[in-house]
Regions:
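Internal transmembrane alpha-helix with an interfacial aromatic "cap," most often the third helix
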Residues: 79-141, 172-173
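Short aromatic-rich membrane-water interface segments that cap or initiate transmembrane helices
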Residues: 65-77, 146-160, 221-231
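Perimembrane loop-to-helix junctions flanking transmembrane segments
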Residues: 52-72
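Alpha-helical transmembrane segments of multi-pass membrane proteins
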Residues: 37-55
Length: 267
């Protein structure tokens, strides 16, 4: 193993008290814990806001109250997510690593854990969205005085929650393909399929609303214009081969780290 690979490695701790091990655990997984707590707080805040303002000011898009309490939220969501996705993606690409030989097995393994942490946060966010607003979306089409593309649940689901998944996936895709040696200078097909599937839900939503405007007045779950959501939702199945990839690469890195640690102890 080259000296460059060794010097760039992250030290692996051993022994110590429970407190020190817990501290090391939270430090290693701080992305998952901090970001997870943040998305839970955002999800809870949006759900509370919808509970307070949906019926009070969200039943008529053309009412002054809707323009005051819901449209600024929509504009803010679009601006924040656009800036976050573009700025983060550009930063990760501009600071990318070009020499995979400088990434040692310990550093590589720590990055796999970070990647799993980000995926855990995405799963937590998807569950939060499903629990807090998806179940009521179809009902809102029957509740609003004049059914439009802008309802309280639409503003939360289609203009923030689903785009937020894309806002996390795109930078993560770039990070993984510029920081992990196994993905550098190549493309993971399962990873790409997940990103494209979630991304394409947004234009499919536009097609869905166009269809509701001209063809389907009722929210029929099995309507053909809803088939795209099912097909694109199936892209999540690609997480299975992606997980197999990651665990296989992590197993190899763990073996390398264990061998490296043993050689250090022997020396």
């Amino acid at each position: 193993m080259t000296q460059a690979r060794v010097t760039n490695d992250v030290a692996v701790g051993s022994g110590g008290s429970f407190a020190s091990k817990a501290s090391a655990h939270f430090k290693r997984n701080r992305i998952a814990w901090v970001f997870g707590a943040l998305v839970l707080a955002v999800g809870a805040g949006l759900r509370l806001y919808m509970g307070m303002m949906a019926f009070a000011a969200g039943t008529d898009y053309y009412s002054p109250e809707f323009q005051v309490y819901w449209m600024p939220l929509l504009y803010g969501e679009v601006i924040v997510l656009s800036v976050f996705t573009i700025a983060t993606s550009i930063y990760l690409w501009m600071t990318r690593e070009t020499d995979a030989s400088k990434i040692g097995p310990e550093l590589e393994l720590s990055r796999y854990w970070k990647l799993l942490g980000v995926f855990s946060v995405m799963g937590l966010w998807a569950a939060t969205v499903a629990i807090t607003s998806v179940e009521s979306d179809a009902a809102w089409h029957q509740v609003t005085i004049r059914d439009t593309d802008f309802t309280p649940t639409h503003i939360i689901i289609f203009y923030f929650s689903l785009p937020f998944l894309t806002a996390m996936l795109v930078p993560t895709f770039i990070w993984a393909h510029t920081r992990l040696p196994v993905y550098m200078n190549r493309v993971s097909i399962p990873f790409l399929a997940v990103v494209i599937g979630i991304l394409m839900i947004m234009p499919n939503y536009g097609f869905n609303e166009w269809g509701h405007t001209f063809f389907y007045a009722e929210e029929l779950f099995a309507a053909p214009i809803h088939w795209g959501f099912v097909l694109l939702g199936w892209s999540l199945f690609f997480f299975v081969p992606l997980a197999v990839q990651l665990f296989m690469y992590m197993g190899r890195s763990i073996s390398q780290v264990a061998a490296l640690k043993h050689s250090r102890q022997a020396a």
